[in-house]
Amino acid sequence: MMITSTNPMVYTDFPDPDIIRVGGVYYMATTTMHFTPGCDILRSYDLVHWEFIAHALNIVADTPEERLECEGANAYGRGMWAPSLRYHRGTWYVLFAANDTHTSYLLTADDPCGPWRKRELDGFYYDSGLFFDDDDRAYVVHGQSTLRITELNPELSGPMPGGLDRVIVQDDPQADLGYEGSHLYKHDGRYYVFTCHFPQGKGKTEACLMAESLDGAFEVREIIEDDLSFHGYGVAQGGMVDTPDGDWYAFMMQDRGGVGRVPILMPMRFGEDGFPVVGENGKVPQSVSVPAASCAEPVTPINGSEFIARYNAEGGVDANCLQPYWQFNHIPHNEYWSLTERPGAFRLHSGRISSNLNHAWNTLTQRTMGPVTVAEVTVDASTLHDGDFAGLAAFQGCYSYIALTRRNGRTMLTVQYKPVNDDSIFSDDDWDSPAVTDAEIMADADCMRLRAVYDFIDCKDEVTFFYRDADTPESEWCPLGTAHRMVFKMDHFTGCRIGLFLYSTKETGGIADFYDFAYSAPDTKEREQ
């Protein structure tokens, strides 16, 4: 039996996907940048329905930048990049590089659900692709513009002394972006490197290099150049995976504006000359058919409304156990958040003075979903201090939010934002300016229900904010402020996220409680037939 799913495969920010199959099960690793815990590991039985099974990475490194230790020190847009997921002789591997520490890390596990172990490698392997050959020797393809293949030692701790270490291709110096995001495979005795780039004057494309041996000449061919009729954003950067029946699929990603970089799936076969033939008639299909899973569908959602993931044997909350779809912005300061101090609520304590949302500790985030996501939460601001802000955000570099704030002993409801200077992907590197106020009113109570609607339809990329009395759920939603842009930029280098936050501008010690969170993603496209 086959099922048909429309692209994107998953309409959310899962950048730099790497997918492998072990037995009848597919596994995916994805970039998590500055969010903690990181390196999401997902599982699927049909390449369409995915569930979280682990975060392979607790933290990248215990540094001032990763901890948001002080203003001027952050890991935005850096952290955990481009994982390479492999399984070899009973061990699971994830290799990735962190640009803030300029270090490559290898994660290993006996079970993909964890626990995972972390160690550093000798050398820095940018956008690395791990590969085990038939003789168990390990290699990594890596680099930007200039791609190299480097043999690793048997301990996988660094380069093999005297081993293979060679340049396999050099991109055109005039390319808008050189080769990167590479994955290395072997099929029917040939070696394949999938890699993406921006040829001069073109969109993002995927190339494939093919050779008869790792020390032989690699032939290069563009294998897909298409934007799925979506605003010129090319589909690229990924690899290939087969089914138990021997069918092949290519997986890549596509920039989709404010929602981020989303996984794309397409059929693939090998041509008579050995090169992959990707898509349908040279194009990425709007929908793709895959074999239906022979087992029950996954039960763990990739988004949701619950804070708590599990309870202990006595029925109480396992402290610090959040659902896997929640991640903190940077390394959390655990003494300043709790799931147990107020039953059913996520509580934040103010632990330092911050100039704006980008510097706030313990902002709790969840991915938005295209084409539309709606988030609601009740915020109790009765124990805020003057100058505190607690609320619901469209969390990105040019953030916006609706929040309760305390001023001169009065509780106010405000919409604030960081202005978008232009639509380019480049950051203005302004982390410190205070937010701009769009609208502000007196709050009817210290406890209010807040709502954000994130609209990504056809790159509209706007968020609108609403409020109502928390004690009268039948009351109508009242809009506050104007619509705000959600622009994907390299400052955060991630899609816009839902954010629950508290920060102080005058004194520490304030408390905010968040409860009855509700997540919904009305999906206007048919996912399955």
Regions found by a protein language model. Give the residues of each.
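Carbohydrate-active catalytic/glycan-binding domains of CAZyme proteins
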Residues: 1-529
